[in-house]
Amino acid sequence: MNPAPIFQKPGSALILLGHGSTVNPDSSAPTLYHAGEIKRRGCFGEVVCAFWKEEPGFRQVLDMVESTDIYIVPNFISEGYFTQKIIPRELGLHGPVTTLPARPGRPARILKYCEPAGNHSRMTEFLLDRAREAAPGVDPGQAALVIVGHGTSLNENSGLAVNKQAARIRARHQYAEVLGMFIEQTPFVTGWQQHTTAPNVIVVPFFISDGMHSYQDIPVLLGIQAARGAAAGGAEIFRRDPYSIGGRRLYYSSAIGADRLFTDVILDQVLRFDTRRPRLSCAPDAASSLSPGCARR
């Protein structure tokens, strides 16, 4: 990915939206980290987070910012049910640009709905990085790479995102096999032994954060954990690689969204919005200026 332009938006707010969890604190950790890093760089006048399953919730977040120019970036892995249905409904969005009329004590505001972080082209590199980290020294030519997504019957885009990444990596001809598999749609990850033949199998969860799915659900479905364990402290599952199953070695990676370079992906989604809709970024209170504050770290 090319270096992001250096920018500063002191008159604008950034709202970063995550899923969150009522039972696992690790679920919101990446979103909170990236928001904190963006705030530290001084990129926006305001930076706040909101979550579907934690406080503050989606419906509260617009009352948490004073800016009239607001960028909203979903820290989600794909453009699917949450980004197309839930978030627009909860925030009252009507497409990429929504104008909220003035009301007593609050001027009119412009909401700029950016693409989810997971739509960024850098996802392919994050997946490959995770695979290399999980199985250092393993020859990709002797390995199957399995990318695991959630999958859902509610929106086909959830599966499309995984399959798109699998196709991109397959086209590089690095791994002996590259497959997209799922928790809740076919092909189910439970069938990994039938769908792969390589002696080494590397499994990378295509999720923003580590939580119930990567700590518990996927390990049980893979057969590397007998039953669902405790919600917290599940990172131990990644430290036991490789697992020996059916005469083959299975390597299991953590999710990709905790990568610190993910912060730059979030900023890139704001820049992409401005590039595609430049006239919306020319208002005096929303002007961008060159600044070293938002340079990549």
Where in this protein do the model-derived segments appear?
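Active-site-proximal alpha-helix that buttresses catalytic centers in soluble enzyme cores
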Residues: 1-297
